[in-house]
C-alpha cells in the first residue's frame, strides 16, 4: 500500500516534466503589439502541439499505471565516477557500490516500446541513502531473430533526494539505455556534470515478476 501511494505521488509530480523532455517551450510575446495572421496561426498550431504532448504524457502515465503488464524488482548494480573528470583523492573516497532495491510497474505499448513507473533507494557516493522515482521511456529495437533480445534508448524523468541537499526533492531528466533479454534488463543512465561534480554512470538490473 505504501509503495502504491508513493508511485501515485511520483506520477503526479513527474507529469509536468515529461512534455518538456521532447520539445522546448516557446517564449511568450509580451510587447502588446498586434499580431499578424501568420503569427496567430503559428500560435494556434503551437497550442495544439502543446495540448497533444500534454495529452500523450497523461495517457502514457495513466496507461502504465492502470494497465501495467508486469511488476518489476530493481537491483542497483554500479555507480562509476568518470575518472577523466575527477581528482583521484576524491574518487578514492567515494562509494561505488550502490546497495539498495526498488519496485515498479511497466508495459510495452503497441509499438513494442517500454514505459515504466518506479521507485528505488540506494547508497549514494557518500554512502548515504538516496531515493529516486519517476517515469521511464525507452524506444526498443530487436536486432536479431530472437525477439526476447532487445536494445533500448530513451529517458527518465522524476525526482530524487540526497543527504547533502537535506533531502529536498530535486527534479531529474536523464538519458536511459538498456540491454534486455526476456524478463531481465540491464538499464543505465549517465548524470552529466562539471569537474569533480556529477559525471556519474549509474546502472541497475530490472527483473519482471
From Swiss-Prot:
Annotated site residue numbers, Role in the phospholipid gating: 195
Superkingdom: Bacteria
Function text: Transfers a fatty acid residue from the sn-1 position of a phospholipid to the N-linked hydroxyfatty acid chain on the proximal unit of lipid A or its precursors.
GO CC annotation: cell outer membrane
Catalysis performed (reactions): a lipid A + a 1,2-diacyl-sn-glycero-3-phosphocholine = a hepta-acyl lipid A + a 2-acyl-sn-glycero-3-phosphocholine; a lipid IVA + a 1,2-diacyl-sn-glycero-3-phosphocholine = a lipid IVB + a 2-acyl-sn-glycero-3-phosphocholine; a lipid IIA + a 1,2-diacyl-sn-glycero-3-phosphocholine = a lipid IIB + a 2-acyl-sn-glycero-3-phosphocholine
EC number: 2.3.1.251
GO molecular function: acyltransferase activity
Family of this protein: Belongs to the lipid A palmitoyltransferase family.
Role in lipopolysaccharide recognition, annotated site positions: 90
A Pfam family matched in the record: PagP
Organism in which the protein naturally occurs: Pectobacterium parmentieri (strain WPP163) (Pectobacterium wasabiae (strain WPP163))
Signal peptide: 1-24
BP-aspect Gene Ontology terms: lipid A biosynthetic process
Cysteines engaged in disulfide bonds, as pairs: none
Quaternary state and interactors: Homodimer.
Compartments (UniProt record): Cell outer membrane
Active site: 81, 124-125
Record's keyword terms, sorted: Acyltransferase, Cell outer membrane, Membrane, Signal, Transferase
Protein name, as recorded: Lipid A acyltransferase PagP
